[in-house]
């Protein structure tokens, strides 16, 4: 059976990869261990969060499915950091995990050019360093010139609960053992990581009346740019905030010797920013309590996910520690928490397209690349699917820059720096985060979605109208000035805006004050024609215009720098400030330009700047 692209794994990365490829007109096959588990969320019942919300918005702006599915199945919507600047705000939604899975499975099974096979892939067909297809345990051979592996935690997955171990990719599901061994045989650098999840509690056994209530936002902010805000009003459920206490800590600490992560049973490195409860108690012994979030898993509110209590402690300890929390003294555990170890591919083995350097046509995306999180997985899956399809079509790859998208930051970090622990996205990882806001993801990326054919005509028309209105308004604010007449100063005083002393550009008037829609319209009534979405963009762009200009200048300078040629006789070991590792890599690769040097794994922007300075000094004869 012949295909153009084969995707192995039906999780968040595999869904976006297979949908993107198929929607671009490429014949695609998705191989998954259990068809009913397509779109299953292995851990928390939520999408988004700080920086993660940016990724979901970017996936959506490019034509991915995650944002639409979240809006269709969400049971609580919030904007995190709402009181802070727009660059660090993050959208987050609680999802109905059952409905999310059903939605995604239905979309996948009803997409043209996309077939689904419930099988276990056990190897690849590789000839002369080029992938030709996939083999399965049932003896089937599926041929394709592009294969995308999105195996999540299933590669050599090993679950730990106390001293008990079980080979599995997720609780109750087979691990992918043969494929993991096959990848090692290809010479790929394979490592071992660990993650975990918490116990799920029978909701009727929890007393939420003694906990802090955490409601959703009103009105609820949708994720997708394609969702109609005027009609978006889903039923929202509250989450609850509870706390561990000294008794909880005593129970956990007295059982450290039974914890797989302390006994030496677990070898893989766990996520730094999502530690298990036993790790938190061990690392932060001076803290009297830790915050936990009690989150509904479905709209039926039958089970609660205890966010903040990920654990692999034995089941008797899990029950005792859960019942020590106020409001949970009668808690009944439906599913026990566990840790899982799994294989991952060193992401420095990859190109920026997510194609492996050693095997032509083989791509990897998601947790297999060392990341953690549904959102990071979806972003990689989308880009792998897009680039595999573009390669089939003989077109140029789509590589998003660091100044263009958080997706660009994510992939660039992975393929140039690599990772020894599960990688999570943060806004602090982006150098140009004022340009990479959630609210302007469509302005940044929907042009690519349009070119790729991943966005429908109705959305494109709406997007282009929005883009036109924003440009029109900003051009007016940049090109027109106002003088400090008595009448105008009175208007500024009336709305509490900063007064001006000289003839001032409108964009600077807004940039100096805390403007909202009403204040701006009181000064410029003609702006009342813009809807709230457009007005929001106008206000942010105006307020931060000078900072945005500065960041854009830095980006332009970087682009110019990367064009600079490196002299053939340039000696890297004479450059002070470069590590031995970077020197070795540069000497081996012998790049001809700074851009070529930037593509080398481990060569940082700081290293490029140092080399640039030395090139300029050598040209001036100063060294």
Swiss-Prot record:
InterPro entries hit by this protein: FAD/NAD-bd_sf, GIDA_C_N, MnmG, MnmG-rel, MnmG-rel_CS, MnmG_C, MnmG_C_subdom, MnmG_C_subdom_sf
Positions contributing to NAD(+) binding: 270-284
Keyword tags: Cytoplasm, FAD, Flavoprotein, NAD, tRNA processing
Cofactors demanded by this protein: FAD
tRNA processing listed as a keyword: yes
Secretion signal span: none
An annotated GO cellular component: cytosol
GO molecular function, one term: flavin adenine dinucleotide binding
Localization per record: Cytoplasm
Gene3D superfamilies, per database record: FAD/NAD(P)-binding domain, GidA associated domain, C-terminal subdomain, tRNA uridine 5-carboxymethylaminomethyl modification enzyme MnmG/GidA
Annotated binding of FAD, by residue: 9-14
PROSITE patterns reported for this sequence: GIDA_1, GIDA_2
GO terms of biological process kind: tRNA methylation; tRNA wobble uridine modification
Similarity comment: Belongs to the MnmG family.
Task of the protein: NAD-binding protein involved in the addition of a carboxymethylaminomethyl (cmnm) group at the wobble position (U34) of certain tRNAs, forming tRNA-cmnm(5)s(2)U34.
NCBIfam families per record: mnmG_gidA
Protein's UniProt name: tRNA uridine 5-carboxymethylaminomethyl modification enzyme MnmG
Lineage: Bacteria, Pseudomonadati, Campylobacterota, Epsilonproteobacteria, Campylobacterales
Gene: mnmG
